[in-house]
């Protein structure tokens, strides 16, 4: 009874902190908060609080239920949110690349945690006795590796999607500061065509001289390089987790069903997802191939992960149907 109440309290605390952090992120998008010192950093600290809250929630549910909390969709979503929180904390303590990674990990952890605790899965939060197929020591090894792999691959894929958006985004040519009065005076002195010509010429000169580091294109290039750098490394870690998860699942399947591979829908989509990210890593080994090509492959992998993760849960068929939205 005590553990049940504690789990309920931790769930509400986590969701409340997530809601506050989400509000802060939305405010930073629509309101200029640069003058408020430490306001944006408070959202990062909120994710750290959420991490410890989710950790306590998982341990409490583990003790209360008597098994590792990865037996249904609700528990796997909580664990996935925990995985995103880990990545966020790594970037939080790595001040050099903090802004690049947190823009992906924080909202992801927020939305997943919010969805899991919002009441949409009202039939899932109640802990139940494990079905016979899950009563194995392989549960912790297999499912945790798969969820950690999903989390890392989703994060890396989102970085690749951000890379594509920034790469193909049209940048308006401009060389003056974004000041209303300045724009008004310039528009009064010059025609639009003359301004456009000067802007184009300025852009070319900035790319050719030694002061290229001060141009917008240079910082844009730096951001793209950083996104590609972190996307590759996070996906590499996710691929390792996914591989270990698939192999451990095959051993577990042989012990339970008498076969290493049964071409179950979950197994099939996991294999397709693994193949896509293997192609991604193969492309990255070729230095002559641009990062855009690998980013496109990772973007496809992003969709495949959600199909693999939610597909069987939506259909409720196959050997992995115990993780469907409607528990059996």
UniProtKB/Swiss-Prot annotation:
UniProt record, GO biological process: cytochrome complex assembly
Record's subcellular location: Plastid, Chloroplast thylakoid membrane
Protein name per UniProt: Cytochrome c biogenesis protein CcsA
Record-level GO cellular component terms: chloroplast thylakoid membrane; plasma membrane
Organism annotation: Lepidium virginicum (Virginia pepperweed)
Family listed: Belongs to the CcmF/CycK/Ccl1/NrfE/CcsA family.
Membrane topology reported for the UniProt record: Multi-pass membrane protein
PANTHER family (UniProt xref): CYTOCHROME B_B6 PROTEIN-RELATED, HEME EXPORTER PROTEIN C
Alphabetical keyword list: Chloroplast, Cytochrome c-type biogenesis, Membrane, Plastid, Thylakoid, Transmembrane, Transmembrane helix
Transmembrane region(s): 13-33, 46-66, 73-93, 101-121, 146-166, 234-254, 263-283, 295-315
């Amino acid at each position: 009874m005590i553990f049940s109440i504690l789990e309920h309290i931790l769930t509400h605390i986590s969701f409340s902190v997530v809601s506050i952090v989400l509000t802060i992120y939305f405010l930073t998008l629509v309101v200029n908060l640069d003058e408020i010192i430490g306001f944006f950093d408070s959202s990062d600290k909120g994710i750290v609080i959420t991490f410890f809250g989710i950790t306590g929630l998982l341990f409490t549910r583990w003790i209360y239920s008597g098994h590792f909390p990865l037996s249904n969709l609700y528990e796997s979503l909580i664990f996935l949110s925990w995985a995103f929180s880990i990545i966020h904390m790594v970037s939080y303590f790595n001040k050099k690349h903090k802004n690049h990674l947190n823009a992906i990990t924080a909202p992801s952890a927020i939305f997943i945690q919010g969805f899991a605790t919002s009441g949409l899965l009202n039939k899932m939060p109640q802990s139940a006795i494990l079905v016979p197929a899950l009563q194995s020591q392989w549960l912790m090894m297999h499912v945790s590796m798969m969820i950690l792999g999903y989390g890392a691959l989703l994060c890396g894929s989102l970085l690749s999607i951000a890379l594509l958006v920034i790469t193909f985004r049209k940048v308006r040519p401009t060389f003056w500061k974004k000041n209303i009065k300045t724009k008004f005076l310039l528009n009064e002195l010059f025609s639009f065509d003359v301004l456009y010509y000067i802007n184009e010429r300025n852009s070319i000169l900035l790319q050719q001289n030694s002061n290229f580091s001060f141009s917008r294109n240079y910082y844009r290039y730096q951001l793209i390089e950083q996104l590609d750098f972190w996307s590759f490394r996070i996906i590499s870690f996710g691929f390792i987790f996914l591989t270990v998860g698939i192999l451990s699942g095959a051993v577990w399947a042989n012990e339970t069903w008498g076969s290493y591979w049964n071409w179950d829908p979950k197994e099939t989509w996991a294999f397709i997802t693994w193949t896509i990210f293997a192609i991604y890593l193969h492309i990255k080994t070729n230095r002559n191939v641009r990062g855009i090509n690998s980013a496109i492959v990772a973007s496809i992998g992003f969709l495949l992960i959600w199909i693999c993760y939610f597909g069987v849960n939506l259909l409720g068929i196959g050997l992995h149907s115990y993780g469907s939205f409607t528990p059996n």
